[in-house]
Amino acid sequence: MINNQTLARPYAKAAFEYASAANGSDAWSGMLGLAAAVVEAPEVAELLRNPRLTRESKVEAVLRLFADDVDEAFRNFIANLGEHDRLFVLPTVREQFEAYKAEAEKTIDVELETAYELSAEQLETLAAALSKRLDRSVNPRQVVNPALIGGLVIRAGDLVVDGSVRGKLSQLAESLKS
């Protein structure tokens, strides 16, 4: 069976290309966020799974919830998704759209898991170093986890760098078991 990532990809790509050409990627990002939130609502998700409703009635119901907050092109996009019975992939379309947007803008979200709260200066220094290393503008988000004991774990996309004391102790324990 085909997964949501595969189903969403052509829609996300088309949406991103359209939004980029129209200089509206931020607006489309917001509209996709709104639409994704709507279809993720339990009541709407149940409605979309109802086999007795036609595709057109599902589109009408979904659009009724946010039609005033989106432009005509976006309403057409939603209608196209509905016509192909793909409204349920909107959250995945949004995720992929954001990935395309981040790639185009050369930005990346980075999670910094630390044992204690970093100062603004430390966070800024770390973000600058990561920005240089990753060749992207970094959007750091700090997560405090005292279980790390010290150091930090950096997560940026597929990259994970564990420089924590807990990580080093785990590596040492593994090497001693060998």
From Swiss-Prot:
GO cellular component terms, A-Z: plasma membrane; proton-transporting ATP synthase complex
Subcellular location as annotated: Cell inner membrane
InterPro entries: ATP_synth_OSCP/delta_N_sf (IPR026015), ATPase_OSCP/dsu (IPR000711)
Superkingdom of this protein's organism: Bacteria
Keyword Membrane: yes
Pfam families xrefs: OSCP (PF00213)
Membrane topology: Peripheral membrane protein
GO molecular function: proton-transporting ATP synthase activity, rotational mechanism
Alphabetized UniProt keyword annotations: ATP synthesis, Cell inner membrane, Cell membrane, CF(1), Hydrogen ion transport, Ion transport, Membrane, Transport
Keyword Cell inner membrane belongs to the record: yes
Role of this protein: F(1)F(0) ATP synthase produces ATP from ADP in the presence of a proton or sodium gradient. F-type ATPases consist of two structural domains, F(1) containing the extramembraneous catalytic core and F(0) containing the membrane proton channel, linked together by a central stalk and a peripheral stalk. During catalysis, ATP synthesis in the catalytic domain of F(1) is coupled via a rotary mechanism of the central stalk subunits to proton translocation.
Subunit note: F-type ATPases have 2 components, F(1) - the catalytic core - and F(0) - the membrane proton channel. F(1) has five subunits: alpha(3), beta(3), gamma(1), delta(1), epsilon(1). F(0) has three main subunits: a(1), b(2) and c(10-14). The alpha and beta chains form an alternating ring which encloses part of the gamma chain. F(1) is attached to F(0) by a central stalk formed by the gamma and epsilon chains, while a peripheral stalk is formed by the delta and b chains.
UniProt family annotation: Belongs to the ATPase delta chain family.
Annotated protein name in UniProt: ATP synthase subunit delta
